[in-house]
From Swiss-Prot:
<dbReference type="Pfam" id="PF00773">
    <property type="entry name" value="RNB"/>
</dbReference>
<dbReference type="GO" id="GO:0008859">
    <property type="term" value="F:exoribonuclease II activity"/>
</dbReference>
<dbReference type="GO" id="GO:0003723">
    <property type="term" value="F:RNA binding"/>
</dbReference>
<dbReference type="InterPro" id="IPR022966">
    <property type="entry name" value="RNase_II/R_CS"/>
</dbReference>
<comment type="function">
    <text>Involved in mRNA degradation. Hydrolyzes single-stranded polyribonucleotides processively in the 3' to 5' direction.</text>
</comment>
<dbReference type="Pfam" id="PF00575">
    <property type="entry name" value="S1"/>
</dbReference>
<dbReference type="InterPro" id="IPR003029">
    <property type="entry name" value="S1_domain"/>
</dbReference>
<keyword id="KW-0963">Cytoplasm</keyword>
<protein>
    <recommendedName>
        <fullName>Exoribonuclease 2</fullName>
        <ecNumber>3.1.13.1</ecNumber>
    </recommendedName>
</protein>
<keyword id="KW-0694">RNA-binding</keyword>
<dbReference type="GO" id="GO:0005829">
    <property type="term" value="C:cytosol"/>
</dbReference>
<dbReference type="InterPro" id="IPR004476">
    <property type="entry name" value="RNase_II/RNase_R"/>
</dbReference>
<keyword id="KW-0540">Nuclease</keyword>
<dbReference type="InterPro" id="IPR012340">
    <property type="entry name" value="NA-bd_OB-fold"/>
</dbReference>
<dbReference type="InterPro" id="IPR001900">
    <property type="entry name" value="RNase_II/R"/>
</dbReference>
<dbReference type="GO" id="GO:0006402">
    <property type="term" value="P:mRNA catabolic process"/>
</dbReference>
<dbReference type="InterPro" id="IPR011804">
    <property type="entry name" value="RNase_II"/>
</dbReference>
């Protein structure tokens, strides 16, 4: 009777139009209910039955209803699903398969089936790549996915590596070598094989791409020669290997092993500056004045060199510090090490005065067993030998930035513009509230930024430094010159790691064009997008594998009395994030572990402090002691508790 009633249809349409709607992102919880977050400002409750239609992270449009004075969101339309391609663990019951996504807030199994081309017989515990196919808000009965690739079985000790690489869609293997001969015969190379070049690396390094040699000019100045491996002598632009390297963009360094950008025969052999082997290189020569100033005589050329010694960071540092048993193999090598130390001291002094020097932070290295188990985590402090190489590489990259800018006006540049102009007022307010005079306009200039950084570095704690970091931009890759505020330099273009960075290979080709006087073509902007995206993915992969290994390493210590010194790196509404100083692991301290009465405590990201009854008890950058309360292996989260 009411079926074709136009009045009823009109009423329905009216109700539909009048029902308030909001667009937002679903936030799941471990308790079955969820919230719809709108513009990060307002959130609406989603009851458990309605959460069955959506997934954490989905962007949806929902209708709003009021139930017992509470506004409730009812999911209506899917705008953008959270999951498309994902990795997870397969469950098999009888002959039915489902997959649980590997994500902290996605606990429910999704029904799935392998695509036709996939012949693997999936078992419970297997890891797989999947693609979402069905979603309840698209009119489907439930969630459904296709299994598109088998990653490995659940018993594989190397699950952290294989799953992480699959998650970020990164290569597992080195590229395959194709027949490659030295081809740039028309490039005149000077013979520098008689000079005492040395390499300084870790003991295990095989892909040595830089060698150094210094000559004392006798007037307080030094002539530094930096020789860099020349893979573009073997890899033609747009050749098969070049396209592979362009796609990979970087060698991917993960705990325990690396996946090279170029075939190992090139990276670890033909191009590697091995001792007593004649190698083609690009060379930069520059005079360094007694005060560390780079001379105007920057000169690039192609050459042959022969490294006279493969030196190791710790051994060189020990020798310079007068400790350990190691000795240079002869007086020539000893002289080179001593001269390199002079280069380092002069350049470091110049950069402290005229640019910016990063504070030394330790590196953490996982010592792994044959089954991928973590035997130990070694803290590697940056010592004098590390600083020698760093200063020489920075000098070389400044020289390249100048040569490319003055001769071509383009290249692959690392650019960092300091404060975000939209946030600089807020940065100035935070500084002024903490007793540091700051003019927002001055902070946007390179001298103003450098002056502020030097002031912050001289303060007794890093509290203020960590507070204003969020108002700064990220470093970018650009095809035109621009300042690098983070280094305090007017221009910076890297060319010193062409075996492991594709952008450096591009700069090599441009430098060769300058050397030979040939026409050079400006790199396409698309290449900077690819480099930035790959750098992001590689960093995420390194972090993900690290989190997994930290969880494995710290799990036996959960619930014990073992104490760890830690630094507070972030304050959130829910608690504190800390870094364990002995091993580099990041842990979370939930607010209830800090103080039992929630109403008496304020955890403020705005001020970077935790206050109890109005008193500040913790601040960002504070050093505290913690115990490991729990390690959640399925999410690789470490939960800590402060030692009171």
């Amino acid at each position: 009777m009411f079926q074709d009633n136009p009045l009823l249809a009109q009423l329905k349409q009216q109700l539909h139009t009048q029902t308030p709607r909001v667009e937002g992102v679903v936030k799941g919880t471990e308790k079955g209910f969820g919230f719809l977050e709108v513009d990060g400002q307002k959130s609406y409750f989603i009851p458990p039955p309605q959460m069955k239609k959506v997934m954490h992270g989905d962007r949806i449009i929902a209708t709003l209803h009021t139930d017992k004075d509470r506004e409730i969101a009812e999911p209506e339309t899917l705008v953008e699903p959270f999951l498309s391609r994902f990795v997870g663990r397969v469950q098999r019951k009888d002959d039915r398969l489902s997959i649980v996504p590997d994500h902290p807030l996605l606990r429910d199994a999704i029904q799935c089936r392998p695509v036709r081309e996939l012949t693997h017989d999936f078992q419970s515990g297997d890891w797989a790549v999947a693609e979402m196919r069905r979603h309840p808000l698209k009119g489907d009965r439930g969630f459904n996915a296709d299994l598109t690739a088998f990653i490995t079985d659940g018993e594989d000790h190397f699950v952290p590596w294989w799953v992480t690489l699959a998650r970020h869609n990164l290569e597992r293997e080195a590229p395959v070598m194709v027949e490659s001969a030295l081809h740039d015969a028309n490039l005149q190379r000077e013979d520098l094989t008689a000079l005492n070049f040395v390499t300084i690396d870790s003991a295990s390094t095989e892909d040595m791409d830089d060698a150094l040699q210094v000559q004392d000019n006798g007037d307080g100045s030094l002539l530094l020669t930096i020789a860099i491996a020349d893979p573009t002598a073997y890899v033609d632009e747009n050749s098969e290997l070049d396209l592979i390297a362009r796609k990979r963009a970087f060698t991917n360094y993960l705990p325990g092993f690396n996946i090279p950008m170029l075939p190992r025969d090139l990276s670890d052999n033909l191009c590697s500056l091995r001792p007593n082997e004649r190698r083609p290189v690009l060379v930069c020569r520059v005079t360094i004045a007694a005060d560390g100033t780079l001379g105007e005589d920057i000169h690039f050329s192609a050459a042959w060199v022969e490294s006279k010694a493969k030196l190791v960071y710790d051994e060189v540092s020990d020798w310079l510090e007068g400790s350990g048993d190691w000795q240079p193999q002869n007086a020539d090598i000893a002289e080179q090490i001593t001269l390199l130390k002079r280069v380092c001291e002069a350049r470091s002094h110049w950069r402290e005065q005229h640019a910016l020097v990063f504070k030394d932070r330790p590196d953490y290295r996982f010592l792994l067993g044959e089954k991928g188990e973590v035997l130990d985590i070694i803290v590697e402090h940056r010592r004098i030998a590390n600083r020698i190489v760093e200063e020489c590489m920075i000098a070389a990259n400044v020289c390249a930035a100048i040569a490319l800018r003055d001769n071509l006006g383009f290249g692959i540049y690392n650019v960092h513009t300091g404060f975000d102009p939209a946030l600089v007022e807020q940065a100035a307010n935070v500084l002024q509230a903490n007793g540091v005079e700051a003019d927002p306009q001055a902070l946007l200039t390179l001298p103003g930024f450098c002056e502020l950084r030097r002031h912050l570095d001289a303060l007794p704690t890093q509290f203020l430094d960590s507070r204003i970091r969020r108002f700064q931009t990220f470093a970018e890759i650009s095809t035109v010159p621009g300042p690098h505020f983070g280094l305090g330099l007017e221009a910076y273009a890297t060319w010193t790691s062409p075996i492991r960075k594709y952008g450096d290979m591009v700069n090599h080709r441009l430098l060769k064009a300058i050397i030979t006087g040939q026409q050079a073509e400006k790199p396409q902007d698309e290449i900077t997008v690819q480099l930035a995206e790959r750098r992001r993915l590689n960093r995420m992969a390194e972090r993900d594998v690290g989190d997994w290994l930290y969880a494995r390493y710290l799990q036996p210590m959960a619930g014990t009395d073992t104490r760890f010194p830690a630094e507070i790196i972030d304050v959130t509404r829910g608690g504190l994030r800390v870094r364990l100083l002995d091993n580099g692991a990041v842990a979370f301290i939930p607010a209830p572990f800090i103080h039992a009465v929630r109403d008496e405590m304020v955890c403020s990201q705005e001020t970077g402090t935790v206050q109890i009854k109005g008193e500040t008890v913790y601040s960002q950058s504070d050093k505290i002691e913690v115990r490991i309360a729990e390690v959640r292996m399925e999410t690789r989260n470490v939960v800590a508790r402060p030692v009171v």
